[in-house]
């Protein structure tokens, strides 16, 4: 056991985590040169296309250290994006240490800080690594000072390496062996294994990634899942070298995968503990704190026949992604679907794209909303996550919206633009600290504003230099209203949005204009209105197409033309009272982008 090292790699987006993992695998000979490819751990097509890590991946390597011993390194490559921070905290729970990778050109950024604090809270040993020192813009001395100044860990003798060229990677490995503690645990105690991650394989059933905290696990053991009490036999067990390799068992302190032939998707939830069926452990390990979704949106299959396969797809995805929440919902405009909860807009995009790709579904999304707290006049408090659940205005005593605490790190020269942006988003500044050339701003901004497009706007006003980390702080009383969109006098429930009263007029006008461009012209006029309660605040009309009925009259009396025109008018009136307007798919998507430009 004293030759095992478990660690994660944490860093901000694009600071070179995945490339460093590649080098570690290559140096330790985990894969032959032929099988090696860039970002070998980003196994999803989506990850490779966007160049980001979404799922944490684990690898077991054997490293021949300079002191002559062979060490077993179990490491987990983690995502850097704020939407996937729960992946990071789960990975850290399985480790004793973390490599904090910092780009020697960019310096410390918000996610670096957030992930590093998470690691310190869990009492992990944090080892700083300065990456990308082969770049002409690299300033390792300045960045080392920055790490000490902002993060507060000793970084003067931090390892300098370049993951791309492979320079200094052996030093990183030596640092890991020297500084990260060996796992603690009792090999002879009853088994306690923490499930870090699970995914569904159509041949094997549920595959779980586990970290053995106490005891050991062998093939053909009978094990019990502690939360459900079900007993299973271990069919296959092994490690990733990044390839799945079968072994006979896992010892204390090791990380590996287990297949027990569990077919029920909820059979082995993430954060659960496995133990032996006979004389097992008394109590379960402390799991992970449940993450609450921040953004909710309705997802509906375009053809209603896909509803069942959509439910299956969500089930399988939620096994792999513990933070996805969903419940059935129905809409008069869109039929049956699910109300899903996500951690942020990127998470929502990724999930939607994974559903469409991996499960071949065509989906419509409704406008995303955050969770609001409403105090009713009878004194009860309710939480709503969709405009449809909002009670009538007369029964609402006060409405509270979620406020997010945002930590923004940016170079001084962009401070003006960023502050303007925060004020526009109804933000309140609570703190500001200078660290060398960097400024750390703390703002309290309504979650609804942060979640929609704050991240994109922040990146564009600061030319990509500002970085953001945010978390839910509290609910605060606010003047929110529900904006309904009416087409020909009928409310379309899927187009309703909850917005702040100050922005309601503007949002309403914009949505109405947008809809006018997107709804195809019919044989009759279509009125598109935006309303708050019974008060109409914006309106626009899609003009009717008309046939030239008087074309066949040549000369002749004006009353003949009048008769034909009146007859046409009557017909249009009748069509208008009976005609239904189909709202095209693009119109629902347009709602998402209102207020961006």
Curated annotation (Swiss-Prot):
**InterPro entries, alphabetically?**
EF-4, EFG_III/V, EFG_V-like, EFTu-like_2, G_TR_CS, LepA_C_sf, LepA_CTD, LepA_IV
Superkingdom of the source species:
Bacteria
Q: Which Pfam families match?
A: EFG_C, GTP_EFTU, GTP_EFTU_D2, LepA_C
GO CC, alphabetical: plasma membrane
Annotated EC = 3.6.5.n1
Cellular localisation: Cell inner membrane
Q: Name one GO molecular function term.
A: translation elongation factor activity
Residues spanning the membrane: none
Q: What is this protein called?
A: Elongation factor 4
Q: Which organism is it from?
A: Aeromonas hydrophila subsp. hydrophila (strain ATCC 7966 / DSM 30187 / BCRC 13018 / CCUG 14551 / JCM 1027 / KCTC 2358 / NCIMB 9240 / NCTC 8049)
Q: Which taxonomic lineage is given here? A: Bacteria, Pseudomonadati, Pseudomonadota, Gammaproteobacteria, Aeromonadales
């Amino acid at each position: 056991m004293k030759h095992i090292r478990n660690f994660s790699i944490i860093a901000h987006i694009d600071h070179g985590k995945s490339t460093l993992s590649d080098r570690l695998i290559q140096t330790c000979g985990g894969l032959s040169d032929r099988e090696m490819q860039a970002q070998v751990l980003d196994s999803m097509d989506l990850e490779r296309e966007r160049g980001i890590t979404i799922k944490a991946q684990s690898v077991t390597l054997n490293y021949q250290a300079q002191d002559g011993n062979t060490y077993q390194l179990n490491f987990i490559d983690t995502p850097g994006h704020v939407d996937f921070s729960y992946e990071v905290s789960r990975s850290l729970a399985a480790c004793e240490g973390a490599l904090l990778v910092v780009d020697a050109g960019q310096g410390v950024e918000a996610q670096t800080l957030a992930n590093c604090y998470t690691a310190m809270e869990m009492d992990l040993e944090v080892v700083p690594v300065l990456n990308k020192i082969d770049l002409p813009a690299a300033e390792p001395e300045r960045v080392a000072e920055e790490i000490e100044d902002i993060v507060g860990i000793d970084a003067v003798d931090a390892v300098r390496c370049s993951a791309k060229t492979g320079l200094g990677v052996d030093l990183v490995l030596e640092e890991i062996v020297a500084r990260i503690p060996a796992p603690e645990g009792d090999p002879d105690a009853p088994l306690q294994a923490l499930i870090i991650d699970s995914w569904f394989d159509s041949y094997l059933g549920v595959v779980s990634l586990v970290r053995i905290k106490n005891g050991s696990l062998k093939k053909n053991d009978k094990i019990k899942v502690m939360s459900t009490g079900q007993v299973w036999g271990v069919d296959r067990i092994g490690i990733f070298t990044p390839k799945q390799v079968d072994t006979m068992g896992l010892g204390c302190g090791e990380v590996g995968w287990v297949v027990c032939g569990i077919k029920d998707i909820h059979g082995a939830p993430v954060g659960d503990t496995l133990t032996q069926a006979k004389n097992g452990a008394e109590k379960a390990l402390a799991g992970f704190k449940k993450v609450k979704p921040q953004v909710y949106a309705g997802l509906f299959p375009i053809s209603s026949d896909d509803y069942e396969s959509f439910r299956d797809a969500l089930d399988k995805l939620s096994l792999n992604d513990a933070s996805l929440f969903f419940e059935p919902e129905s809409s008069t405009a869109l039929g049956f679907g699910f109300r899903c909860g996500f951690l942020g807009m990127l998470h929502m995009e990724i999930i939607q794209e994974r559903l469409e790709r991996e499960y071949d579904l065509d989906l419509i999304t409704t406008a995303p909303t955050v969770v609001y707290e409403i105090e009713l006049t009878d004194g009860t408090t309710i939480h709503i996550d969709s405009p449809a659940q909002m009670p009538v205005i007369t029964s609402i005593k006060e409405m509270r919206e979620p406020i997010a605490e945002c930590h923004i790190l940016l170079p001084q020269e962009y401070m003006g633009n960023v502050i303007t942006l925060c004020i526009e988003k109804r933000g309140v500044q609570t703190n500001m600290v200078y660290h060398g050339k960097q400024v750390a701003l703390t703002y309290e901004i309504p979650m609804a504003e942060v979640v929609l497009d704050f991240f994109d706007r922040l990146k564009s006003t600061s030319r990509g230099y500002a970085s953001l980390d945010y978390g839910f702080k509290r609910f605060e009383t606010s003047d929110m209203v529900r904006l309904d969109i009416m087409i020909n006098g009928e409310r379309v429930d899927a187009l309703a949005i909850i917005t702040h009263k100050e922005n309601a007029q503007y949002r309403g006008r914009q949505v109405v204009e947008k809809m006018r461009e997107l709804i195809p012209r019919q044989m009759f006029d279509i009125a598109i209105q935006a309303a708050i309660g019974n008060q109409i605040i914006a309106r626009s009309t899609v003009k009717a197409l008309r046939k030239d009925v008087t074309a066949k009259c040549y000369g002749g009396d004006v009353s003949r033309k009048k008769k034909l025109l009146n007859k046409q008018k009557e017909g249009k009136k009748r069509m208008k009272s009976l005609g239904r307007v189909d709202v095209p798919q693009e119109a629902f998507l347009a709602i998402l982008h209102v207020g961006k430009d």
